[in-house]
Amino acid sequence: MDMRIYKNIPKRILSLCLVFAIGISMGVLSDHFVSENSRFQTFTEKLFRSEVCSNTLTLHYTLAHPEKKGIRKPEATLGTALSDPAKTTSLCQEYEKELKSFAYSRLSEENRLTCDMLLLYFHTRASLGKNSALDEPLGPGLGVQAQLPILLAEYTFRTKEDISDYLKLLSTVRPYFQSIIKLEKQKSQSGLFMSDTTLNRILKQCHSFVANPDSNYMDDIFAQKLKAFSNPAFSSEDQKKLCTYHHKLILTEVIPAYQELADSLESLRGTGKSSRGLAFFEGGREYYLYLLQSQTGTYVPVGQIEKRLSAQLLSDYREISSLLEQNSSLIDRLNQCSGELTLTPTQMLEKLPELMKKDFPELNDATYELRTVHPSMKKFLSPAFYLTPPVDTRSPNVIYINDSGRTSSLELFGTLAHEGFPGHLYQTVSFAENNPSDIRYLVTSSGYVEGWATYVESYGYEYAASLMKNPDSAQNAVRLAWLNRSMNLCIYSLIDIGIHYRGWDAARTAVFLKAFGINNASTAAEIYQYIVETPGNYLKYYWGYLNFLDLKTVCQKRLGDDFDLKEFHRRILDIGPVQFPVLEKYMKQWN
């Protein structure tokens, strides 16, 4: 442009023209940014509404008031166990294509993070393909037949409509189980049915559930919840009628559904292979890699995972040896520690937020309820667990205590750190304070969630020492306890890879365990069988833990004296549950 035309324009007018031009361009750009972010948020909201309505349990546990988000409750259903792999792959690819259509550079940082997480999620889901035939909904520990009664028992009654939906759900257990039966028959025909050993363990659970139909624990819990209901409260007569109807549904719907499931599974006995890992099945190794990516959130080669696990195992072993060399009576001191930790679970949870202040950011609000597990459910549940609140109410945050006396007070303290502060409850509340988009609650990363809880559990052990009679002498003893737990989780993680990726059988696993002093044949067999039935489960906890540990080391090296532990934790919590490549990408921005 020939600038000479401006030579006679007064400077003040020229400056106004420039300001006006900049203002127009900024306005256009701003509208463009707003438009792209608005379009992206519309997409994620639509995705959330679609996913959250997949079944009544998902909707109820995620949203307390779906109507406020314009979501109409569908007819109560548990959904189906059957799926169309080709349709699922196609849908995931469509979502991936739509995500790539957004102008990434015009998205806000929060939306870019969500976009990165969703892209990786759908790309991974689409990679499953025909290997979805290896999915197993049943299992002695984490199977749907074991978890469903607990999910139904904990179904919150906020309104009378919730009670009505719950009762309708009981009538859908049978068709849901029938879809599982159909799936298991397909697996049997394809040579993918479970081993007789796993079958026996599942049947034992089913038979236990139906053994005493007139004294089923779900009846007791329902009556207890009705009595506590106050929106509005039921009369004694109405409570009695509802309890009678509930008992009828248990007798005519739920128990027959479990009996039919057990009978159908029994008819397939002998059609599966002996207890073996995924490596023995066609596509098994690829499916295992998919589990590591989708559940653990890691995309690191298996060989690299094994190398890191082995290094940690050696490091922990050397530290234990060093501690015992310095003080040979440390094990005796450790045995004393639990006796010195005389706090009740309530007192432990009250102490933890104060003890963790030096290492973790404080929360604005972290109210919670402590409840005791119903006596009839004690044998089915862990020593403590956290029940995530609906995303639209963010309350109640409930921690259940199972006082069955199966753990020492030190182990319970560590468990409460894992489930409460600074573990699951703390992480959930902290993340919610940033008001993330709803889809972030549905599409998450178990590796982040369980890895974080395991990572902070180590701090819980450290905090426990400060509550004992002689904190200084207790510190090393408690450190010994954590290192022992770390080594156990590491050993199980290596076995997980050995069984499902390297093809270890029971004998090879027993040899590996003997190297660490586990010589009891029945113990080795139980460890082997559990890991066969829960591929990748230990890695969610332990590989997740190591990712946080290594990320801390990387940040310490990069920032040097500027590294601040509390700030490190704050940034991880602000990013929230994502796959580890995404977490690492955004943590690199910390300078």
Give the residues covered by each predicted segment.
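N-terminal maturation segment of proteins
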Residues: 6-591
